[in-house]
């Protein structure tokens, strides 16, 4: 099965100068886990996900896991979330983006998602995003084909 058979062609994207607040609202409202970041020529320059949205709220999360007892006032830290609302996506987006083509096998897309710990991949053809393929759509297609679910 090819990526083109599963990809969603209704691609919601953002630009590098989209604000944190706007991208968070967009992902939440449309109930998607991420979106490609496109430049003015509609080329993929990054990807922003729910994980990136949460991670910027907790820039200290790695040190927290090393020494959780040193973080006593979590509410005060969370109250500073408003300070980042105008931060541009280009500051916290992922830059080294893995993409697939419409002709790639879905098993390749699935393997790339697992290897890179992502749940969605932009589908690119001739340098332009033509769709998004999700781990969920691959999972469902494989179960349906192999187990009749």
Describe the residue ranges of each PLM region.
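Ca2+-coordinating acidic residues in Ca2+-binding motifs
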Residues: 5, 52, 137
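A short, polar/charged loop-to-alpha-helix boundary motif
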Residues: 54-69, 138-149
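Short hydrophobic beta-strand motif reused across regulatory alpha/beta modules
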Residues: 46-49, 132-138
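Bateman/CBS regulatory modules and CBS-like beta-alpha motifs in cytosolic regions of diverse proteins
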Residues: 1-32, 37-40, 44-45, 68-112, ...
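Extended hydrophobic
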Residues: 114-115, 121, 138
């Amino acid at each position: 099965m090819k990526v083109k058979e599963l990809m969603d062609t209704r691609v919601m994207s953002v630009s590098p100068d989209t604000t944190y607040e706007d991208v968070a609202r967009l992902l939440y409202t449309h109930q998607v886990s991420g979106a490609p970041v496109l430049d003015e020529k509609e080329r993929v320059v990054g990807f922003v996900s729910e994980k990136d949205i949460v991670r910027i709220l907790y820039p200290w999360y790695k040190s927290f896991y090393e020494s959780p007892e040193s973080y006593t006032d979590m509410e005060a830290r969370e109250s500073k979330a408003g300070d980042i609302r105008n931060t541009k996506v280009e500051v916290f987006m992922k830059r080294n983006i893995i993409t697939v083509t419409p002709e790639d096998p879905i098993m390749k897309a699935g393997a790339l998602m697992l290897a890179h710990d992502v749940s969605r991949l932009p589908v690119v053809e001739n340098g332009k995003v033509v769709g998004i393929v999700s781990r969920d759509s691959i999972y469902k297609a494989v179960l349906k084909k192999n187990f009749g679910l």
